[in-house]
Amino acid sequence: MSMKGKETMSKQNEKLVVGKLGSSYGIRGWLKVFSYTDNPESIFDYSPWYIDQKGEWVEYKVEGWKRHNKGWVVKLQGLDVREDAHLLTNFEIAIDPASLPELSEDEFYWRELFGMQVVTTNGYDLGVVTDMMETGSNDVLVVKANLKDAFGQKERLIPFLEEQVIKVVDRQAQRIEVDWDPAF
């Protein structure tokens, strides 16, 4: 099993947030880009982009992009002057989740795991996946424990380690089976 993508899910109109626009660059409407994808350059593989403006997703087409110092800059269609680009500084970039590539059966996007029930191999209900963390060595499930958890836990951090900890991920049943001590 492997995890693909650090993308975070935005529930509004089923868009998937994959990055953020930074400050304007130059005088011709370019903007700096901060990518949340595993491979930062892959953010440019998706088009169109959607920018949340006053609660509405506004569609933008990527006209061009290039490497700049240690990051990236992008030119969005319709933004031709610095002042227009500046208005989008710090706005999140989203895409249509349907544009994501299909994964193999043993690969998952983080967003697929959110809301899944987590149970031990002995059947103890640990709670529900509410978030994911990247630690560098492996991804970590953030599991909100049930209100009346027998071990007094409110939240559990469970490493997403195939075979060692994660035994089964059942997309159909929305359930993850883990080899994990409920006291942790």
From Swiss-Prot:
Pfam family, one: PRC
Record keyword Chaperone present: yes
Keyword Secreted appears in the UniProt entry: no
Record-level GO BP terms: ribosomal small subunit biogenesis; rRNA processing
GO molecular function (one): ribosome binding
Keyword line: Chaperone, Cytoplasm, Ribosome biogenesis, rRNA processing
Subcellular location: Cytoplasm
Annotated InterPro entries: PRC-brl_dom (IPR027275), PRC_barrel-like_sf (IPR011033), RimM (IPR011961), RimM_N (IPR002676), RimM_N_sf (IPR036976), Transl_B-barrel_sf (IPR009000)
Assigned GO CC terms: cytoplasm; ribosome
Domain PRC barrel span(s) in chain numbering: 105-184
Top-level taxon of the source organism: Bacteria
Functional summary from the UniProt entry: An accessory protein needed during the final step in the assembly of 30S ribosomal subunit, possibly for assembly of the head region. Essential for efficient processing of 16S rRNA. May be needed both before and after RbfA during the maturation of 16S rRNA. It has affinity for free ribosomal 30S subunits but not for 70S ribosomes.
Quaternary context: Binds ribosomal protein uS19.
Domain notes: The PRC barrel domain binds ribosomal protein uS19.
Family membership noted in the UniProt record: Belongs to the RimM family.
Protein name: Ribosome maturation factor RimM
